[in-house]
Amino acid sequence: MAQPDDAALPFSLLQFYATSPYPCSYLPDREARSQVATPAHLIDSEIYSSLIRTGFRRSGIFTYRPHCDGCKACVPVRLPVTELRPNRSQRRAMKHHAKLRVRELPLVYIDEHYALYNRYQQARHPGGGMDEDSHEQYAQFLLQSRVDTRLIEFSDDEGIRMVSLIDVLDDGLSSVYTFYDPDIPDASFGTYNILWQAAQCQALGLPYLYLGYWIANSRKMAYKAMFQPIEGLIDGHWLALPKLEKT
């Protein structure tokens, strides 16, 4: 298996800097730092694909990875999609939402999407700051991209149920962000979305679905451990993590 090599990154083109410490969004009473790749306008899809393989992620036009002092809790993870074996509840979610209508749309602002985003943030992440995002903050976070990004809308006869942002890489898809209707209990939209994205990887002949970071002691991240098999980037090497447990 090819391993990422930081020495092979385009350092001649990019510069990397560490941010000042800020409160960690996932582990209470901890501070986080990020390493940011700049300048943003030079990070095209090819370079971004290389950065993803070394643990970077994207938020708007900013590409970053954790760079925390004395903490390595954030583990970049990806699914090898041809090996993915959904469990019973995951198969049930796929069947339950099989009739959702799926549309790929331009990366533009849509009032209904922003309204759904606000409802999702207020229900799932109250008090986290994003539940107060303005139109401009929403657009900067999700609708600004310098790489190959797809906006996917899922709907039924009652309206829009879920919106997902996906980046296309040279070896897979990267799940950027997903928000969905929070008012339907036990809908498992998130589970369905990951399996749908994995199926899209297979349809495109791409081997991996990148899911961002998994943190053992963060409930927000626990769902990622439910998809097996899964690989994690440990000390610069992508390794199978067969014993991840839901926490």
Curated annotation (Swiss-Prot):
InterPro entries: Acyl_CoA_acyltransferase, Asp_Glu_LeuTrfase, N-end_Aminoacyl_Trfase, N-end_Aminoacyl_Trfase_C, N-end_Aminoacyl_Trfase_N. GO terms for biological process: ubiquitin-dependent protein catabolic process via the N-end rule pathway. GO terms for cellular component: cytoplasm. It is found in: Cytoplasm. Belongs to the R-transferase family. Bpt subfamily. Transmembrane segments: none annotated. The keyword Plastid does not apply. HAMAP family: Bpt. GO terms for molecular function: arginyl-tRNA--protein transferase activity; leucyl-tRNA--protein transferase activity. It catalyses: N-terminal L-glutamyl-[protein] + L-leucyl-tRNA(Leu) = N-terminal L-leucyl-L-glutamyl-[protein] + tRNA(Leu) + H(+); N-terminal L-aspartyl-[protein] + L-leucyl-tRNA(Leu) = N-terminal L-leucyl-L-aspartyl-[protein] + tRNA(Leu) + H(+). Keywords: Acyltransferase, Cytoplasm, Transferase. This is Aspartate/glutamate leucyltransferase. Its EC number is 2.3.2.29. Functions in the N-end rule pathway of protein degradation where it conjugates Leu from its aminoacyl-tRNA to the N-termini of proteins containing an N-terminal aspartate or glutamate. Its main location: cytoplasm.
